[in-house]
A protein has these predicted regions:
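A short beta-strand-loop structural module common to alpha/beta enzyme folds
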Residues: 29-42
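N-terminal beta-loop-helix "entrance" segment that forms/cooperates
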Residues: 40-57
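N-terminal beta1-alpha1 ligand-phosphate binding loop
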Residues: 5-19
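Conserved TIR/SEFIR loop-to-helix hotspot centered on a Trp-containing motif
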Residues: 87-99
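TIR-domain catalytic/interaction hotspot
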Residues: 56-79
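A short helix->loop->beta-strand "cap" motif at the edges of active sites that frequently abuts
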Residues: 103-107
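Conserved small/polar residues in nucleotide/adenosyl-binding loops
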Residues: 126-132
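Catalytic phosphate/metal-binding cores of nucleic-acid and nucleotide-processing enzymes, i.e., regions
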Residues: 12, 116-119
Length: 136
């Protein structure tokens, strides 16, 4: 049986690739899915619905399109891994963790020790929390 693992969180490091490479070396049967990780593509997801003069409406349309993908992939996953980075506010990661909890999906959180306190509520339902990415 292949595991369907949803990778959520910050997009500014190669943590997803590290996990994929590590589990491939171990021969684990995993299929990975993720939100759109290219920032420009994510921001432009709703552009095919028409050009907007106001960025609010561009963001609104793109977020609606992106949310269809995110919700569907979280609902279909066996487990999620949510990485909270130390840069930028991690709204999407926190929201995805909340969706996992609401949908009854087990999830693992990854984050650095420096942000343990601000994440205490966001990770309170997690099944496992790791301070760093641990690969064999």
């Amino acid at each position: 049986m292949d595991w369907n693992v949803y990778l959520s969180g910050e997009i500014h490091t190669d943590w997803r690739e590290q996990i994929k490479e590590g589990t491939k070396k171990l021969g684990l049967p995993i299929i990975y899915t993720s939100a759109v990780t290219d920032h420009e593509s994510s921001d432009a997801a709703g552009d095919h619905l028409g050009v907007e003069e106001n960025n609010f409406w561009r963001d609104h349309k793109s977020s609606k399109i992106n949310s269809i993908r995110t919700k569907t992939l979280i609902e279909k996953c066996d487990i999620a891994i949510v990485r909270f980075g130390d840069k930028f506010k991690q709204w999407n990661a926190a929201f995805d963790a909340g969706c996992c909890a609401a949908f009854g999906k087990p999830y693992i959180t990854l984050h650095d020790e420096e942000i343990i306190h601000p994440l205490k509520e966001a990770v309170s339902y997690t099944h496992l929390t790791l301070p760093t990415i641990l690969l064999v």
